[in-house]
Amino acid sequence: LEIADLAQYVVDLTAR
């Protein structure tokens, strides 16, 4: 697990 993966996940959610 990398922080970048979590960041990308959060960005995807907030980008909706």
From Swiss-Prot:
Localization per record: Secreted
Organism: Biomphalaria glabrata
Claim: 4Fe-4S is one of the keywords in the record: no
Record key words, sorted: Lectin, Secreted
ATP-binding as UniProt keyword: no
Name of the featured protein: Hemolymph 65 kDa lectin BG05
GO molecular function: carbohydrate binding
Function: Binds and precipitates antigens of the parasite Echinostoma paraensei.
